[in-house]
A protein has these predicted regions:
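Pyridoxal 5′-phosphate
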Residues: 1-408
């Protein structure tokens, strides 16, 4: 597939910004939506708009089928053993909080510890802090190496017989560095600890086989994968889910209810209380199918690799710029670049480049502990997707140079 052909599936890319062609480079925050996903959203919302799992009439049956067919698709996509291991949520943040409130509340207590990575997004830090405040457990911080990936040798010192859970991202949303998850999982399991992997960035760029990778928990968001907002997924091993108490109480997650006793539904519905976001969840299927197609397409893969090499080399060659995680090299990273420009505030850079038609993220990236490690309050981030072109990468570097010249 040609990149131009792929771009036609994303009408949002064709718009202008301040009279210039939009160069959208905030894909790590959220991707643009593909037409196929929006068509499904429109179809379900107009033609099959009925609550799922509750009624026998035709519209409800059709809505339920669309919802549950999506679960089957996600199970196959991740190579999970069972559809019961796929929980739909609103996003990665909700998924991680679900694990903290269920697995955490039941299995983690005073005297136990949780290992959390230094470069994690706040959504994989704060839920564990709150859990430790409630239970008296301890958080241990797994540092990054000078390259920006997690320090496996330090992990061997941190994980002990009291470690119940290790929480790490597949790929940092700031550094773009691919972490040594296989080693982390293998060592953690050898000590009896479970592992939660934040796949918010990883699921976008890497094919995932949860059985082969032996993840205990895996969380990601469809809105970064061409689907609608509100399309979160939590994968968890069935044997863990069976032992975990419900997170929220209400409709759908019950077996029977009386004032004397309530029993709970079978998996996965025990963790899907209330009316689900039934009109957007089905957008996961066409969106993730398209994403998989891009990962398997040689021409599109080569295009992203070319972008990665070009931008990496250009940033590393400029002595005015510090590329966070640059020491990891180009081979162990995705095309996500967080930069610090000496003497220039990241917000000013973002504002100037916005007027040039380049959409970038600025700020602390919801990773303040990592900002502290880097010695800054914020950065400027450019993140590329399969529909971005090498010409857009060149435009990014050209506009960045112009913006720096204006601001210095």
């Amino acid at each position: 597939m040609k990149v131009r052909e792929l771009r036609e599936k994303f009408p949002g890319l064709a718009q202008e910004c301040y009279g210039r062609e939009l160069v959208y480079l905030d894909n790590a925050a959220t991707s643009q939506r593909c037409v196929a996903a929006m068509d499904v959203l429109s179809d379900v919302s107009i033609n099959h708009n009925a609550n799922v799992h509750r009624s026998v009439y035709k519209l409800a049956a059709e809505a339920t089928k669309a919802y549950e067919d999506t679960r089957d698709f996600v199970r196959e996509y991740l190579n999970a053993r069972s559809r019961e291991e796929i929980i739909f949520t609103s996003g990665t943040t909700f998924s991680i909080n679900l694990v903290a409130r269920t697995f955490g509340e039941k299995f983690i207590g005073k005297g136990d510890n949780i290992v959390v990575g230094e470069s994690e997004h706040h959504s994989n830090i704060v839920p564990w802090q709150l859990l430790c405040e409630r239970t008296g457990a301890e958080i241990r911080v797994l540092p990054i190496t000078p390259r920006g990936d997690y320090d496996v040798e330090r992990l061997r010192e941190l994980v002990d017989a009291h470690t119940k859970l290790v929480c790490v991202a597949q790929i940092s949303n700031v550094l773009g560095v691919i972490n040594p998850i296989d080693e982390i999982v293998a060592f953690s399991h050898s000590k009896g600890a479970k592992v939660l992997v934040d796949g918010a960035q990883g699921a976008v760029h890497l094919m995932v086989d949860v059985q082969k990778m032996d993840y205990d928990f895996y969380a990601f968001s469809g809105h970064k994968m061409f689907a609608s907002k509100g399309t979160g997924v939590l994968y968890a091993k069935k044997e863990l889910l069976e032992e975990m108490p419900p997170f929220l109480g209400g409709g759908e997650m019950i077996g029977t209810v009386s004032f004397e006793k309530t029993t709970f539904a079978e998996l996965p519905y025990k963790f899907e209380a209330g009316t689900p976001n039934f009109n957007v969840i089905p957008t996961l299927k066409p969106a993730m199918a398209l994403l998989k197609e891009t990962m398997e397409d040689a021409e599109l893969t080569e295009n992203l690799e070319s972008i990665n090499r070009y931008v990496y080399d250009a940033l590393m060659a400029d002595d005015r710029i510090v590329l966070a995680g640059g020491k990891a090299g180009v081979e162990n990273r995705i095309p996500l670049f967080s930069i610090i420009v000496k003497g220039v505030h990241h917000e000013d850079l973002a504002l100037v480049m916005d007027k040039m038609g380049v959409a970038l993220r600025s700020g602390h990236m919801c990773a303040e502990p990592l900002m502290g490690r880097l010695g800054v309050t914020g950065i400027l981030r450019a993140s590329f997707a399969p529909y971005n072109t090498l010409e857009e990468a060149e435009e990014f570097i050209k506009c960045l140079n112009r913006a720096i010249d204006i601001l210095l």
